Structures are given as C-alpha cells and as structure tokens.
Amino acid sequence: MDPLKICENYLTFRSIIKGSTFSPGVFRRWRFHALADVVGNIVEREEGRFWEIVPETHTLWALFRGGFTVAPFTEILTSLQLENRGRQLAFLAFLSFLLRNWPSDSVVSEDARLDLVCAPAWSRIQIWSQAARLINDLPESVFEGQGSVVEEECGEEHLARDSDDPFFD
C-alpha cells in the first residue's frame, strides 16, 4: 500500500483523514478507505508520543482555538519528510491527532477544520510526490561521483534506524 499514491486525489485524502478521526469499529472500516483505519489505529497506539510532541500547554492549541492555522501549518509542513511509508503514515496520523484534539471552544467550525488541515497538507504531499518523481526520472549520470547527501548529513548509524515503521525505536 502506497499512502502517497492513494492520497493523490484531494477528496480521497480528505475522506481518509476524516475517517481516521472516528473511533475504531465497523463504521470506520465499512464507510472509509482501509487507509483511514490504519491511520486511526496508529493515532490510538501512538497518542502518547503525539502528546509529547505537542503537549496540551503548547502554543499550537491556543492558535487553533483562535482560528490561526497558517503559521502553525507552515512550520509543520516545511520540515516534512515523506521518503518512506512509515513517515507518510506518521504524518497522516499526526494530522488526525490534531483534528481529534482540536479545542472544542475554537472559533473554527468542525466542518472548516478538516479543510484547514487537509488543504495545505495535501498540497505539500503533492509537491513532495512531484519532486520525488522528477528525481527518479533524472538519468543516473547526474548522480555519478556524488555521495549521498543523506549519508553525509546523518551518518550510517541513523540510516540503519530508518524504517517503514512510523515510530521505530
């Protein structure tokens, strides 16, 4: 299952994120794409880690309460790395986590929240996918004689830990 391929269509992506916010059960499995169930299960399993990233006292929640979403999402999306399925699923789960825990006293209606989260995220996913396709289409001669930037920046010990698991230990 390639999450980015499945999320190429905005309405499908939106439906997956919406479905992942529902409680586990027959409704989520029957009504939404299978990826929504996978993402929802990741959110439930890793909710503690998400709360460590964005605790209840974090400024992000106050911004969401006031309806300010552009700056927080710009910050989140500019650092986004989607090079493997684990990171892709973790990102989708994080979006679902944000929607599930959006302050109930926010000035943003529940209907608008979904699009405020999905539109910039989907745009970033499309940019990432297009860039990856362009890089894959480059001839091999372009890369000859050049070491991998990732290897130089991260070192082999970090690369050995990279995985399709969204939260490898």
From Swiss-Prot:
Q: Which PROSITE patterns match?
A: BCL2_FAMILY
- Keywords in alphabetical order: Early protein, Host-virus interaction, Inhibition of host apoptosis by viral BCL2-like protein, Modulation of host cell apoptosis by virus
- Determine the domain of life of the protein's source: Viruses
GO terms, biological process: symbiont-mediated suppression of host apoptosis
A Pfam family of the record is Adeno_E1B_19K
Belongs to which family? Belongs to the adenoviridae E1B 19 kDa protein family.
Q: What is this protein called?
A: E1B protein, small T-antigen
